Amino acid sequence: MAGGAIVASGGASRSSEYQGGLTAYVLLVALVAACGGMLLGYDNGVTGGVASMEQFERKFFPDVYEKKQQIVETSPYCTYDNPKLQLFVSSLFLAGLISCIFSAWITRNWGRKASMGIGGIFFIAAGGLVNAFAQDIAMLIVGRVLLGFGVGLGSQVVPQYLSEVAPFSHRGMLNIGYQLFVTIGILIAGLVNYGVRNWDNGWRLSLGLAAVPGLILLLGAIVLPESPNFLVEKGRTDQGRRILEKLRGTSHVEAEFADIVAAVEIARPITMRQSWRSLFTRRYMPQLLTSFVIQFFQQFTGINAIIFYVPVLFSSLGSASSAALLNTVVVGAVNVGSTMIAVLLSDKFGRRFLLIEGGITCCLAMLAAGITLGVEFGQYGTEDLPHPVSAGVLAVICIFIAGFAWSWGPMGWLIPSEIFTLETRPAGTAVAVMGNFLFSFVIGQAFVSMLCAMKFGVFLFFAGWLVIMVLCAIFLLPETKGVPIERVQALYARHWFWKKVMGPAAQEIIAEDEKRVAASQAIMKEERISQTMK
């Protein structure tokens, strides 16, 4: 929602006018909403582990099983190069991409709570019913598609909701709660896969338990308050004010509420169709490009290639199935711990610093992994990796995961949720999530084929992209730490590069921002006079 310090013309800081802080109530609201991240996390974590279980492979992917048992001779790099297996992994993201088109309309017209509830229902139906009882690949893919609809809705609305309910000084911390629960979902999935690895049809339980995070999101949608921004936008101003006061723990919310009202007055005349069209004008192009490119960069760190395929990767390198699944648990634990670091650091050091530092860490780790595999495993991998080398590869992957988890992971969700204006926010966040799912689909569909074709070079490929990401973060990304989201567009209008992209609209935005500040101050003055008279 609103929040933070940005210096307006004349040098006046707005942050001192925002009252209230981090209350127990807003913490509880953010905690329940952030649980929606477990939908995406559990699915990401469970997929690769299930794909490495022999019972699952024999039933759905016998070609892969024969390669693993060396019934069919092949390079270890190519063991899992199977189009149907890749479709099983990536089909969810194609469905999620499509669902984002509808989720923006639902979020703007029915509210944030409705989007969360519908997403939870899709996840319960798909995880609890279709995938758990799948009899063939077709049924498995149908379940994945339904899961994709649920993940698409949850991923679009939860970060947006968290940004709208969070106080300015803790927006980064609370929004990263979504990514934290993504990592918790990944860890839980790894533990479940490891626990049922020797059970008959244990893979059914692994897939079926996806219904649990869906149920949590559905229940959360019932008990959570609606976003004050949405209520004001729908004309329920008094209710929006009451919820804002409860979230902030004070009745003195004049400045923040005035900013919301001013933003709504600009957004209200704009229809959903106009919102989508506006995104592609020069006025909003900087935010659109930022959010979309961040999603591209997030996936081309190689993160989902690692998360999806950690068990598969270590199986390919010679680890037994149980050891490969245990490695997944280790990676998941590192992921959770490092994301907790991001929760503490994002509002202290800012978004750009974490992206730059994390990008450098990930790049060095990818280089180390590629060089180690190139030297020890070679192009053909005729022998299993020695245990010390395998442990070294695991350590390097954990360093990569740590660097990603406090940078490109949480920032990939936080930044798009806080840079769009109210009138374009549902459509803008939908485009960001669509980009995430599009590139997740590409990586999920292509990684094992890339591993087969490029061998250890696939890690060097991702390292090259990480260099580009760091440079873009240094030169092209404005720092949004402490900036009220109603005023981020003015930040872009003053940026050395993005003001050129905006063209004449940049000066219009700056003038509108100054006018909005003046209007907010006038409303505050009237309310103070009114309270004094009472």
From Swiss-Prot:
It is found in: Membrane. Residues 1-20, 108-113, 159-173, 226-299, 350-352, 416-433, 478-534 are cytoplasmic. One of its GO terms (cellular component) is membrane. Residues 42-86, 136-137, 195-204, 323-328, 374-394, 455-456 are extracellular. It is a multi-pass membrane protein. InterPro entries: MFS_dom (IPR020846), MFS_STP/MST-like_plant (IPR044778), MFS_sugar_transport-like (IPR005828), MFS_trans_sf (IPR036259), STP/PLT_plant (IPR045262), Sugar/inositol_transpt (IPR003663), Sugar_transporter_CS (IPR005829). Keywords: Membrane, Sugar transport, Symport, Transmembrane, Transmembrane helix, Transport. SUPFAM superfamilies: MFS general substrate transporter (SSF103473). CDD domains: MFS_STP. It comes from the Eukaryota. One of its GO terms (molecular function) is symporter activity. The chain crosses the membrane at residues 21-41, 87-107, 114-135, 138-158, 174-194, 205-225, 300-322, 329-349, 353-373, 395-415, 434-454, 457-477. Its main location: membrane. Belongs to the major facilitator superfamily. Sugar transporter (TC 2.A.1.1) family. PANTHER family: IP12678P, SOLUTE CARRIER FAMILY 2, FACILITATED GLUCOSE TRANSPORTER. Active uptake of hexoses. This is H(+)/hexose cotransporter 3. It comes from Parachlorella kessleri. The lineage of its organism: Eukaryota, Viridiplantae, Chlorophyta, core chlorophytes, Trebouxiophyceae. The gene is HUP3.
